[in-house]
């Protein structure tokens, strides 16, 4: 229970029934506007994949996927997805998408090794999106342009919710602030990555933190990223300050995806060059998959933020430690 933050005198403005209405309101408005602005088509997506395909997201490389055997297929193994970061790029080609077009999915995942707290759950739900780009668009300028488009959707959603609900006030700034992980480390020496994120988010309100995954001058990484989907020089997190919990809150992780050269380099840096032999990774090396940009946007985090909830368990149904459930209820936090 050490990870549970209990805001002083917290009381949800919405009961359980009205919370469900609010969740649907946020999700419907946000995803429809996102699809319109980024030219995305909703597609069906897998809950599990073949481990041998290389399509699962390895996250930081140490998290264990949920694995089960399929009786009809002689107990052939299947993995519950961590995310659809790689599958989406494969799907764009398989489904016949063209330049400038993209897809999005309602992704559900289980992350069994997640350390839970107010904003982390073993159940992950997000809008996973991916879009075909040109080689010329593999640039910081295009990344920032796309981030601004996503951020405008966030701001419009907040404005819409503030009109629908009297208790919601707009807190997102007009513009998002761009900074690299190295610039952030230089700005706040002697701090941890999470401390730096909090400091810059509280100062700016909304931050796009770029270039995540490679080593900084300090010899440390700001955060881990799998080497075979994001280009570590062309990725970003959208982070906002969340006053309900007095924390920095990541709402989206996104990036321009690796091309052949970036993936080979990053696999080598990550110490797993053998992954280049997996089907998905080999397809990138052979230039068989389109160049893309994509990301994941946390559905529960979006709902939590716009409904001003104190715990992600107020907007999604998951399993929590018994002492957390008890302490939350005693302090006005009703977990679903």
Protein language model regions, located:
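A generic secondary-structure signal for well-formed alpha-helical elements
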Residues: 34-41, 150-161, 310
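A translation/RNA-centric and nucleic-acid-associated enzymatic feature enriched
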Residues: 108-110, 180-336
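Class II aminoacyl-tRNA synthetase-like tRNA-binding/catalytic domains
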Residues: 2-120, 128-132
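Extended, charged alpha-beta segments that form solvent-exposed binding/catalytic grooves
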Residues: 105-191, 195
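A general structural signal for short secondary-structure junctions and capping/turn motifs
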Residues: 68-71, 93-99, 119-121, 169, ...
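N-terminal pre-domains immediately preceding structured catalytic cores
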Residues: 52-57, 170-179, 321
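Extracellular structured ligand-interaction cores
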Residues: 101-103, 124-128, 204-206, 246-248
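Generic recognition of stable, solvent-exposed alpha-helical segments in well-folded globular domains
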Residues: 18-25, 29, 138-145, 279, ...
